């Protein structure tokens, strides 16, 4: 079985499985940050699955199940995934109406006759006197007050579906309803939220059409955002983690279903092979080595080089949280790659560096003069905090540091999306558009009611979606940027583009022949884009 990659945060192209949709349990373990696969230190933290629980002091959402679909549950007392009652669900508010009129109390304490008469007079007479008093105090505005009160009462009596239609959203238009709900969350419009969440719950389903499946996780992200902010969000989203062997199985499941990882690996390896052609000593620095899968094909290619293979040294960087998916530390990666190199008769050395990418300094890398240096960032640099998160701006610092090492090539593979600094409504809409394409591409390959597919989407894609929607500041680990922004950063760091060769382009086109015709390959601005239909999803580029 082919080796497969892992992911820190679980970007769209990796997976975290689950054996049982009922296994969600809540935890307030303070060791887990908002980013579920990143620890604040290098201490090993076993990652957890995430379900949802509302911590809102104003209204806790209860889940109500109806038949025939897998659904998500955000109740406080139940697990967030319900399989025993497969269906769409709706929310009700335990606190009742989101709007309530304040009671006004007027106490008379001065012993006046009015105060005495309040006790002794006929109740009907008392009511009339109070109305007369109200008329004097409110004057002509009393009719306005009554009108407003009646309007609120009428609104509250509306069923959510009717209220949504009054907003001009066509019945069943999930995309528009999701965007409207996100806008209501941004505006803190609790009444609109309480109307739209139940209606959304009737439409979304983790076993439905692509947009319905995605919508289930988008709603969970909105609920998590409402529940709290920052690190406490993911305290409400923790669930048990499967054993590492199951984890790897699900990673392989998605790796084979979609070509995104293979595209990234093949394009980066092709650029590296071109850049180090004729070199006798090669040093590759991989800022997210994961399982080391990317380098197997490159070692095989270097072994076939005319005149014999070069000496290869790989520095593998990965923080300790990835050890769970591997079932051990970086030494497992080193042993595996050493075995492959031995079979290929390639002189090989592995240098493990168990540290967060944002903490890497030049002194950690052991660069030796005379080596041809290649630096690889595959679906990793968007995890590195930039200037919008911290004045340290490790994203640009790393690029400047790498440039100071004079590499032959830097390879960058990233998601083509703009969610880093966009305001929340735009970020939500971009996330919806991007992941719609991802879920559609999966839908063409795997049955909708396939349990492995449901688990894969739930425990991989869902946690990234929730992070994008629910978290802010340092807790929002998923910070994608479009290629234009990466190009500007690399240029400012002193890099120049190295267009990918026609051979790389042709090799990837051959790969895509095994997949749907809806996958599109395009080359522009010196970069190679892989997309679904008209939506670019992943972009690969090389720099020197």
Swiss-Prot record:
Main localization category: nucleus
Name the record gives this protein: Chitin-inducible gibberellin-responsive protein 2
Keywords for this protein: Nucleus, Transcription, Transcription regulation
More details: Induction by oligosaccharide elicitor is independent of de novo protein synthesis.
Lineage, broadest ranks: Eukaryota, Viridiplantae, Streptophyta, Embryophyta, Tracheophyta
One cellular component (GO) term of this entry: nucleus
Residue span of motif VHIID: 282-286
Chain positions covered by the region annotation Leucine repeat II (LRII): 332-364
């Amino acid at each position: 079985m082919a080796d497969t990659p892992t992911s820190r945060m679980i970007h769209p192209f990796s997976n975290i499985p689950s054996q049982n949709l009922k296994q969600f349990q809540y935890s307030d373990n303070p060791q887990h940050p908002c980013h579920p696969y990143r620890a604040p230190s290098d201490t090993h933290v076993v990652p957890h699955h995430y379900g949802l629980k509302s911590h809102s002091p104003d209204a806790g959402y209860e889940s109500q199940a109806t038949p025939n679909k897998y659904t998500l549950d955000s109740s406080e007392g139940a697990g967030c995934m319900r399989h025993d009652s497969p269906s769409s669900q709706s929310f009700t508010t335990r606190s009742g109406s989101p709007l309530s009129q304040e009671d006004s109390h007027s106490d008379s304490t001065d012993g006046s006759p009015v105060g005495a008469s309040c006790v002794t007079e006929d109740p009907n007479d008392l009511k009339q006197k109070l109305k007369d008093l109200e008329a004097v105090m409110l004057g002509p505005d009393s009719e306005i007050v009554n009108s407003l009160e009646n309007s609120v009462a009428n609104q509250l009596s509306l069923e959510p579906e009717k209220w949504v239609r009054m907003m001009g959203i066509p019945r069943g238009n999930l995309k528009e309803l999701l965007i409207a709900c996100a806008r209501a969350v941004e505006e803190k419009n609790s009444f609109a939220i309480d109307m739209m969440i139940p209606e959304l719950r009737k439409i979304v389903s983790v076993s439905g059409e692509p947009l319905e499946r995605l919508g289930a996780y988008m709603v969970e992200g909105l609920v998590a955002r409402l529940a709290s902010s920052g690190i406490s969000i993911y305290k409400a989203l923790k669930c048990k983690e499967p054993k590492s062997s199951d984890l790897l199985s699900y990673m392989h499941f998605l790796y084979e279903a979609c070509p995104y990882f293979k595209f990234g690996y093949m394009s980066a390896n092709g650029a590296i092979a071109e850049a180090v052609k004729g070199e006798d000593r090669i040093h590759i620095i991989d800022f997210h080595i994961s399982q080391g899968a990317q380098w197997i094909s490159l070692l095989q290619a270097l072994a076939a080089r005319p005149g014999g293979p070069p000496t290869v040294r790989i520095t593998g960087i990965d923080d300790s949280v990835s050890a769970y998916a591997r079932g051990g530390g970086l030494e497992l990666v080193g042993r595996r790659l050493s075995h492959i190199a031995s079979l290929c008769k390639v002189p090989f050395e592995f240098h493990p560096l168990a540290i967060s990418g944002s903490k890497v300094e030049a002194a950690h890398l052991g660069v030796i003069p005379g080596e041809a240096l290649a630096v690889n960032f595959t679906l990793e640099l968007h995890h590195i905090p930039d200037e919008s998160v911290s004045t340290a701006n490790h994203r640009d610092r790393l690029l400047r540091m790498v440039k100071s090492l004079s590499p032959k090539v830097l390879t960058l593979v990233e998601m083509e999306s703009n969610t880093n600094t966009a305001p929340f409504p735009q970020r939500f809409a971009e996330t919806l558009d991007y992941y719609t394409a991802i879920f559609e591409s999966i839908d063409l390959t795997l049955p909708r009611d396939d349990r492995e597919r449901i688990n894969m989407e739930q425990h991989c894609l869902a946690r990234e979606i929730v992070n994008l929607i629910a978290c802010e500041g340092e807790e929002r680990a998923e910070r994608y940027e479009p290629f234009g922004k990466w190009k500007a950063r690399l240029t400012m760091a002193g890099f120049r583009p190295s267009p990918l060769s026609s051979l790389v382009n042709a090799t990837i086109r051959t790969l895509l022949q095994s997949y749907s015709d809806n996958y599109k390959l395009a080359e522009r601005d010196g970069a190679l884009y892989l997309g679904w239909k008209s939506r670019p999803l992943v972009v690969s580029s090389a720099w020197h």
